[in-house]
Amino acid sequence: SGFATAVSGHSNRKVREALLKQAEKLTHAPDSPTLPRALLAKKLAEIMPRGLKRSVFGLNGGDAIEIALKLARSYTKKSEIIAFQGGFHGRATYGCMSVTSVNFSKKGCFPQVPGMHHVPYAYCYRCAFGKEYPECNLWCTDYIVNMLEGGMTGLAEPAALIVEPLLG
């Protein structure tokens, strides 16, 4: 499915063997309680910082985004979310579409979820501001700091920052 090749190791031998071993036991369990899920939740509870003992599992990246948005807003009691321009977080749900800045996934689906703010990704190779490092003095980070500290941006205390690690 989708980008499953990236998460399954691009045909790495050890990953293939682990997948085959697991396929002999259980191949699919949508939201069903299973022993592997319980063991993973237990392990996560053991290694998480004090006070963070609960786990929420989703079936895909869209679930991960929706769960993250819900938890961030619920925990912080704040509604604003920052995402980066060029990020793609899915198009199946309104939360995913709203933090995605790619236009083709939003076409005809307005209004979006309120409180989403897109800022330029700090990427020196293709600077959104047309500047060059190091002469720019990391102007892109100053821009984001101004978004957070500036009195006129409406973004003083965001609930979360959503980052796509493979932005491209």
PLM regions: where:
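Short amphipathic alpha-helical interaction patches enriched in hydrophobic/aromatic residues
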Residues: A23-T27
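Conserved PLP phosphate-binding loop immediately N-terminal to the Schiff-base lysine helix
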Residues: Y125, I162-G168
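Short, flexible active-site-proximal loops enriched in glycine and acidic residues
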Residues: H28-L35, G51-S55
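Active-site beta-strand/loop segments that form the cofactor-binding cradle
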Residues: S1-T5, E164-L166
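PLP-dependent aspartate aminotransferase-fold enzymes
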Residues: K42-A159
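A structural motif shared across PLP-dependent enzymes of the aminotransferase-like
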Residues: F3-L20, P30-K43
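Pocket-edge positions in alpha/beta enzyme catalytic cores
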Residues: V7, A29, E132-C136
